[in-house]
A protein has these predicted regions:
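Conserved active-site motif detector
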Residues: 1-91
Length: 91
């Protein structure tokens, strides 16, 4: 089954030709984490965006350092499934 989550433009951190870097929302258990999602599964709908995924989708969440010297270093990494992602955005 396919799922769709609506996000704000503020949750889009970066975009390339093939993928979009999405920030997790602030009041979730993964505040500060980001993940890459295929661009073909991200749609602009007015001022909001949606990203779609199916039940088998696995998300690799990464948290980067905040300092001047470690801003490109992954300081923590978590993997969650489709149900975990739905639960985080439902908070």
């Amino acid at each position: 089954m396919w799922h769709k989550i609506e996000i704000s433009e503020n949750n889009i951190e970066a975009s390339t030709d093939k993928a979009v870097l999405i920030k997790m929302k602030h009041n979730s258990n993964f505040d500060g984490f980001v993940f890459w999602h295929p661009k073909k599964l991200v749609r602009a709908e007015g001022k909001m965006f949606t990203f779609s995924f199916n039940d088998e989708f696995k998300f690799n969440l990464k948290k980067y350092g905040n300092g001047k010297w470690n801003s490109r270093d992954v300081v923590r990494e978590e993997n969650i499934g489709a149900n975990g992602m739905l639960a985080e955005w439902a908070l």
